[in-house]
Every structure is written in structure tokens, then in C-alpha cells.
Design a protein with these regions (language model features):
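Short Pro-Gly-centered beta-turn/loop motif in secreted/extracellular proteins
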Residues: 188-209, 214-216, 225-227
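Short alpha-helix capping/helix-loop boundary micro-motifs
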Residues: 32-33, 86, 90-94
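Short amphipathic beta-strand segments in non-cytosolic proteins
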Residues: 167-191
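Surface-exposed, glycine-biased beta-strand/turn segments
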Residues: 1-68, 74-76, 102, 111, ...
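A generic structural motif
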Residues: 51, 75, 90-93, 128, ...
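Conserved, short, structured surface segments that act as functional micro-motifs
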Residues: 59-71, 98-148
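A residue-level detector for short acidic-glycine micro-motifs
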Residues: 49, 88-91, 108-111, 157, ...
């Protein structure tokens, strides 16, 4: 979102989370904003699709995203194509095939499709822009706010397996409450290189601690958050 818009994802429904078990694991992030708030490109690219999903399916059903824009990013991942999907728009300001720069206007926040309130739903898709399952965590792909960075990591059991739905708290000296849950199931895909199962973006530059309590054991790891960088931690139960 441009300056003045909200860039913080809804806390209960970050990528891979379920809103306290009420919803399916999230395929992207939701940025709550007033209807009509400008939506801009997260990076340079070419508009792959601009329209609605009444006749073409981009999720498990039609008319799910409403008005949407899919941007094929100039950036690639290991030579694989990347796409940013912007959904539930109230207006679309670009056309298919149009080249756009980072920060260029794409449309406006709305609540079209299955949205219950105005917000931007943002996804990152890899390889196939129409495949609902080929998503990755958007917080790894859009730039943090100025002076902020990203914390990603793995929470593992004693055998080194991902622990689903685990609360991770991020304790920082500014006193802000930051928390996230690990991805809820194996269909929520991590980055193939990073192999994370949680991400929390837009943390101001400072030293923080990631902590999670499992089986009565409090696990803690320090993390130095640096502007425009991704810090990484591993929280694993010790072997018996």
C-alpha cells in the first residue's frame, strides 16, 4: 500500500493461519484498509490478468476473489516465474499486458467476491498464476516498511518435523506485542530454500527474541532484526 495505507496483515489470519481454527489455512495475507484506498505494485512487472473471476477460476470456486489483478513480477525465483495476486478490489486501473513500475497504481481496495469487509488480499504464486495451491508467504516477497525487517523461522519437534499451529511470540525492547502461528498443514507451502513455517514482517530494526512453549519447554532464540533483511531462527525441542 502507498504512504497512508495500512501495510500490516490482519494478525489472526496471516499466511498459513486459520483465525483460531474458524477458517481454512490462509493462502495469502489480508491488509485491512478503507474502500477506495489505492493499491500499488509491490515490484516492477507485467499485468498477467486484470478483471473479475466470474468466468475464470483462480481459487477453488469462481467469484471468490471478485475483481483482481495478477502481476507477473520481473523478479524470478531460481528462474521460476513469480506472480502477485491482488484481490477483492473495488476498481481496476490497469489492463492485461501492461508493464508497471514498483509503486504504480493497480486499483483500489474493495470487498468484491467473498470478502466480508474492505481489505486487500495479497498472494504470491509461483510457476502457475491460476493454481490456488502454488502460493508462498507474501511477507517474504514485499519490501518491509522503511527501517524495518522480517523474522522467519522453523518450529520443530524432537524428530525435526514441522510443528503446526504453534504460537510463536516475538519479544522486542519496544514492548510491542508480536505473535504468529506456524503454518497449520502441509499444504501451506514454505519457500523451498528457506523452509520456514512462520514469518512476521515489518519489525523495526532492533534485537528481539523468538519464543515458543512446547511440551512444557520454553524455547528461545535471539534475532537481530535489520532493515530490509530477513532474520532467521530455529526453535526445536531437544531430543530425549
Amino acid at each position: 500500500m502507498p504512504e497512508g495505507g495500512n501495510n500490516y496483515p490482519v494478525s489472526n489470519y496471516r499466511y498459513g493461519m486459520t483465525w483460531d481454527g474458524l477458517l481454512a489455512p490462509h493462502r495469502g495475507v489480508d491488509l485491512a484498509n478503507d474502500e477506495g484506498t489505492p493499491v500499488v505494485a509491490i515490484g516492477p512487472g507485467t499485468v498477467h490478468y486484470a478483471g473479475d473471476d466470474s468466468t475464470q477460476r483462480f481459487a477453488f470456486i469462481k467469484e471468490f476473489y471478485g475483481n483482481l489483478v495478477i502481476l507477473q513480477l520481473d523478479q524470478r525465483w531460481n528462474e521460476r516465474p513469480l506472480f502477485a495476486l491482488y484481490a477483492h478490489l473495488s476498481a481496476i486501473e490497469v489492463e492485461s499486458g501492461q508493464a508497471v513500475a514498483a509503486g504504480e497504481l493497480l486499483g483500489a481496495v474493495g470487498q468484491s467476491g467473498a470478502a466480508l469487509a474492505p481489505h486487500l488480499h495479497l498472494e504470491i504464486r509461483i510457476d502457475d498464476p491460476a493454481n490456488y495451491m502454488m502460493v508462498r508467504n507474501p511477507e517474504l516477497w514485499y519490501s518491509p516498511l522503511s527501517g524495518a525487517g522480517v523474522l522467519a523461522g522453523r518450529v520443530l519437534d524432537r524428530q525435526g518435523r514441522f510443528v503446526p499451529g504453534q504460537l510463536v511470540e516475538i519479544i522486542c525492547p519496544d514492548g510491542g506485542r508480536r505473535w504468529v502461528e506456524t503454518y497449520w498443514n502441509q499444504r501451506t507451502l514454505p519457500d523451498e530454500v528457506m523452509s520456514e513455517n512462520f514469518v512476521f514482517g515489518d519489525i523495526p530494526e532492533m534485537e528481539c527474541t523468538a519464543q515458543a512453549e512446547m511440551d512444557g519447554v520454553m524455547l528461545r532464540q535471539p534475532a537481530q532484526i535489520s532493515a530490509q533483511h530477513i532474520a532467521f531462527v530455529v526453535l526445536q525441542l531437544p531430543a530425549n
